[in-house]
């Protein structure tokens, strides 16, 4: 099993959810592109080993995974929002947050990986996304702040922070292929965020 990323899709020119065959543009001259390009290369290496040596390989492409298992060093926006909410702080956003994302609770992601591993077709890739949790970054932050009764604030980002941003305006994934294998998400976004904040707070 190879765990890839939704970032391999790049920027596509059409609207709608990303299917497993929707590959868009990635700027090769952006240092930020080292991540999605390396993931694409690793996927190709997997299927090359399948062809050359008959390796049984399945690829999964998780969306934005969140949950109480995040570390203090996790710098992703969703992790920062959950951390700030668990400390009952106002949540600070460094952008308008209008980018659309596929969120999925870490426990749902774990079951999705097992389903793909045990039932998936060799050489195929499967998106991991809860179709009930496709929202903007701002909407995710709003749920976090409202759950703990704090404010959502906005600040201008530094140039260094901007350089690390995922440039995909939409990375909403279609999980139909995975669902056809019998998987479905069990955590809706509100309850998943609430559970995550409560668990993180227990460790503080």
Annotate each PLM feature.
Residues 106, 125, 138-139, 161-185, ...:
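Conserved C-terminal active-site "lid" loop/helix of NAD(P)H-dependent oxidoreductases
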Residues 4-5, 43-68:
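Conserved beta-loop-beta element that borders a ligand/cofactor-binding pocket
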Residues 34, 38-41:
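Active-site helix of classical SDR
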Residues 119-162:
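Mid/C-terminal beta-alpha module of Rossmann-like enzyme folds, strongest
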Residues 1-32:
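Conserved Rossmann-fold NAD(P)-dependent oxidoreductase catalytic core, especially the SDR/UDP-sugar
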Residues 189-204:
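Amphipathic terminal alpha-helices
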């Amino acid at each position: 099993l190879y765990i890839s990323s939704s970032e391999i899709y790049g920027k596509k020119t059409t609207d709608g959810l990303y299917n497993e065959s929707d590959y868009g543009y990635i700027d090769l001259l952006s240092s930020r592109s080292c991540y999605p390009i390396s993931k694409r290369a690793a996927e190709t290496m997997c299927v090359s080993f399948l062809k050359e040596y008959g390796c049984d390989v399945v690829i999964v492409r998780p969306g934005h995974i969140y949950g109480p298992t995040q570390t203090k060093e996790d710098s992703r926006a969703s992790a920062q929002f959950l951390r700030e909410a668990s400390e009952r702080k106002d949540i600070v956003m460094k952008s308008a947050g209008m980018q659309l994302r596929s969120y999925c609770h870490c426990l749902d992601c774990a079951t999705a990986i097992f389903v793909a591993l045990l039932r998936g077709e060799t050489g195929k890739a499967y998106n991991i996304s809860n179709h009930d949790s496709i929202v903007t970054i701002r909407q995710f932050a709003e749920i976090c702040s409202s759950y703990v009764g704090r404010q959502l604030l906005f600040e201008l980002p530094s140039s260094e922070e901007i350089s690390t941003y995922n440039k995909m305006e939409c990375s909403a994934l279609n999980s139909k292929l995975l669902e056809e294998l019998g998987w479905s998400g069990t955590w809706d976004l509100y309850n998943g965020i609430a559970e995550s904040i409560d668990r993180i707070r227990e460790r503080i």
